[in-house]
Curated annotation (Swiss-Prot):
Pfam families reported for this sequence: Sugar_tr
Transmembrane segments: 405-425, 453-473, 486-506, 510-530, 537-557, 565-585, 655-675, 686-706, 713-733, 753-773, 780-800, 814-834
Protein name per UniProt: Facilitated trehalose transporter Tret1
Glycan-linked positions: 440
Record keyword NADP present: no
Membrane topology: Multi-pass membrane protein
Extracellular side: 426-452, 507-509, 558-564, 676-685, 734-752, 801-813
Domain of life: Eukaryota
Amino acid sequence: MSGRDNRGAGGGGGGHQPLSSAMGKLKEKLTRAGDDQGYHRVESNLSTSNTATSLDTILPEDPFLFPQAAPQRHPLPRPQQQQQQQQRQQLRLLEDEPPLSFRPLLEDDDINEPPTQPFQQQQQRTPLRASGSLELTPLPPPPTSQEIREHRDRQQRSVPVPVEDLQRSKQSLKGSRVSFEKNNASSKPPAQAESSDEDSFEDKRIGFQQQKATSVDHKGILKDLKHILANDNRRQFQAKKHVSLDVKGTRFLQDLLKESSSEEEFHKTRREFQGRKHQSLDPRVTFKLDKVLQGSSTDSDEEGDDPEHKRLIHRPKDITKPLIIDLKDLESESDEDFHTSRQHFQQQRSISTDSRKSRRPYEMDEMGNKRGENIRHAVPFVRQITEDGKPKLEVYRPTTNPIYIWTQVLAALSVSLGSLVVGFVSAYTSPALVSMTNRNMTSFEVTPQAASWVGGIMPLAGLAGGIAGGPFIEYLGRRNTILATAIPFIVSSLLIACAVNVAMVLAGRFLAGFCVGIASLSLPVYLGETVQPEVRGTLGLLPTAFGNIGILLCFVAGTYMDWSMLAFLGAALPVPFLILMFLIPETPRWFVSRGREEKARKALSWLRGKEADVEPELKGLMRSQADADRQATQNKMMELLKRNNLKPLSISLGLMFFQQLSGINAVIFYTVSIFKDAGSTIDGNLCTIIVGIVNFMATFIATLLIDRAGRKILLYVSNIAMIITLFVLGGFFYCKSHGQDVSQLGWLPLSCFVIYILGFSLGFGPIPWLMMGEILPSKIRGSAASVATAFNWSCTFVVTKTFQDMIDFMGAHGAFWLFGSICFIGLFFVILYVPETQGKTLEDIERKMMGRVRRMSSVANMKPLAFNM
């Protein structure tokens, strides 16, 4: 390109200003574009024949394009340096290609239009030298706006540029005539992105809306699929639902069968009904329920508009549209049939919808619907159901820490040693009276009347101790009350061992009986308030087992010791009991009742373990105590006489009465004497040992059966066993008293005694004590339990005191027949009045007994002391 062409374009003073203005705009635009693309700015002098203009040109950072005038660079980060090195290696492959050139713009050029020259024409230009001089080339005519739009459309429809061409195109200038041609035609320069071109903005918005619509369509398709799937599942459920509720279908079939006039018509009608029935299994089928009308059914009517003979099943046109069914369409002959069908359907639905609910976790009583019934009494009662389908007696949350369970075992073992002392003292008279009535073994005479008082004064003292035990455990505490009985037990045994007359023996027995009455009430209360529910069944057995062990120990030791040495052994037994009681704490519930929260927390920490969290249990005890305080009255004994409380109290007293009037304590106290009078060939002391072992083993058998067979079943078995054995014993003694030879039947008394003890220990031994804690209302449980315990000891005193007199008055056979008759009456009492409490919660039992529900205290869950006395 010659220099005069340029001079002609810019010659004269009038043409210099427009050219300078255009060059200034170009300079500003290229400066911004270069800064955005990461190019350095280099000053160059563009020389013409008569015009010298300073222009800031844009040079790329690659030194290969301009090796003579490489600009100074600042140090770049390592990732950018590595990228530049890769670019240099790629560009060295192009060393044989000629360098690119550019020219300045003329006045008549449109600087806003993109370059249209091909890349091959730019490569034919002369390279830019170090001096900055340029060789100018003529420009082609600028493209029109229509050509630019067509070019953009072709760019949008073009195939994406490869990565190598894209990286190479980044090295070229964008958006001006002083530019290097780029192969990536789809990318736009930043300077052009900043322009306010409405066409470019509209194109971008249209493209974005198309992408958005496409994504929305995909989401809509997924949503429709989910809706169709859910609707299909719902349709299947509706099919099952209305099949179970369709009481009209069977009636319709019956009507059709009744009106069939021939066997062929009968089979045809049955096939049609079966077809409709099996068609209901199709998940795509919904139900159309029509009211059943009272009319005749014929084939012509079924074709017509008679709703009775319309098909109950049809296929809807739109399978995604749900069918709304009104329950009023399910018309039945009576409301009772409708409610029964609905309840049955609800039960089946709860089972079919979730297989995990096939076993009901709870059951609910039906609400009363009597007219005028108070709504507060119509609230249904909910009970938890165990895995075997039976109601659960008590619901507890496991909180036991297995590492520290030994503390609760120690507490249960300590109080159980007190139960061992109680059992030993209770059975003392049976082996001791044999040697005590022997003049060669005592320094004083014991008459038969005095011997009856030795055996009967202890139950009388136990009655007084049972009455006094209630206030003692409330004011002194459970632990302190039990601990206070240890020293009197030792003193009472020493009085008997060192006795020089009958009065000292009676004093020792009275003191021992008073302690037995207190211990029989306080021992189960302590265990109920300290042992956790998870181990209460196992540890609650220890007092009963140790009581029977004490009875067995007394029988065994009595075969080798006289009455004095046996009393010394009884004085030594409370010593370990006394030592262990000092190691265990007071019950947390008693501390809470006295407002000693910190001591209650320490007691719980000792029982549950140092690492256990006792705050939830402590808060529960405080809430329970607050409820008990609100329900408490000043005169608790008057509460026993209320109408709602008399029924459970009378049942508890009746069980205690028939327990003692069965003659159990009389048999235990006079076992040796009975075998001696019977003339049995078996040693009397051996018989007592056998009876004690049977009593001990029967306790564990009853523990295994009481929650499986039920309370009333065991009471039936116990009554029948005692009735049979008592009447057989009475017959044996009747034959002996009338001079008949019974020497060949020496085994019969022992067999009857074993069966009698076994039957008693299975039912009437532990169940009256257990049901006392179950049926007595929580509000009066403390006072009512004291009355029941006192009544039990009163009956024990009467039986043991009058047993010898009954034998003298009516003979042994008369006494056993009397006890058997009382057991026979007790059998009818159990059948008619005693409720079954197996598998029922305390709330349910109280609601059945009293007609309302109260909050149960955890003290009520204690297992009473149930050893035989």
